[in-house]
Amino acid sequence: MSSLVAFAESIEQSQVGTAIAESRYWWPIFEGTHLLSLSISFGLIFVTDLRLIGVWLRRVPVMDVLHQLRPYILGGFVLTFISGGLVFWSEAATVMVSPLWTAKILLILLGGLNALYFEFVIAKRPEVVENRTPLPSSVRYAGLASMTIWTVVIICGRLLAYLPR
């Protein structure tokens, strides 16, 4: 862990890290971009998840919802990742030692694995592709898991900003 902390300190103390942290404009721009892109990507993920669990848009085929929203979800996620990386760059050593940061990163990985499993396994099943009703329980579980994971990721991220480190 000490080598990771040393690496984080070098990132934070780099010219870029210092410039972001000390700038009157860059840090707020990156943080604002992070929050806005987070709202886009995870808001649309929630719409998708609500469809998967059968609460909303029941008459719209799952694959239609995914086809329409996927580019915006992925675009928002890329922007969230880039802006979050820039915010992290300015406070890497401070944030990295927090258990909340570790939980956030592990949950992001878990959320990604859940999405990949859904895309490459569950969404390929005939009953999903053909929009059979009711959808298999695996679809609902994937949606519930996604909603839970991403909600906790957001909570961890927001708590990082306010809890002592």
Regions found by a protein language model. Give the residues of each.
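Polytopic transmembrane helical bundles with strong interfacial aromatic enrichment
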Residues: 1-165
